[in-house]
């Protein structure tokens, strides 16, 4: 669920647990562990933490914000709509970064296993 807060002429959108880093970690861990049953939960946790740490270090805020120009007429509905879309855009961007990292990790593992299998086949000769 998304909640909204108005401060002066700005609207902030955040998930119902707040706009903390830890909520995003918990939510994304649940999502990827559920949707990646063949990948170790430890690997998933490492990648989720790494990606979110990189996002936090780069200055990403874990909320969506919409500011109204002082010359424009303020509209709560429009502000909420813009803030919500900015929040969801950030969330989906982070989620796709994690998915890409997981795919790379799985393909590296697959490549290593394939290489080991080839070596084992050569030994059988």
Residue ranges and their predicted role:
Residues 1-125:
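Catalytic phosphate/metal-binding cores of nucleic-acid and nucleotide-processing enzymes, i.e., regions
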């Amino acid at each position: 669920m998304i909640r909204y807060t108005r401060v002066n002429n700005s609207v902030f959108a955040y998930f119902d647990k707040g706009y903390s880093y830890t909520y995003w970690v918990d939510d994304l861990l649940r999502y990827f562990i559920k949707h990646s049953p063949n990948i170790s939960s430890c690997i998933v946790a490492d990648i989720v933490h790494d990606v979110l740490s990189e996002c936090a270090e780069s200055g990403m805020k874990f909320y969506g914000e919409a500011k109204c120009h002082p010359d424009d007429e303020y509209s709560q509905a429009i502000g909420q709509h813009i803030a919500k879309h900015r929040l969801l855009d950030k969330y989906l961007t982070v989620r796709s970064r994690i998915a890409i990292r997981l795919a790379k990790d799985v393909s590296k593992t697959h490549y290593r296993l394939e290489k080991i299998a080839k070596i084992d086949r050569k030994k059988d000769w």
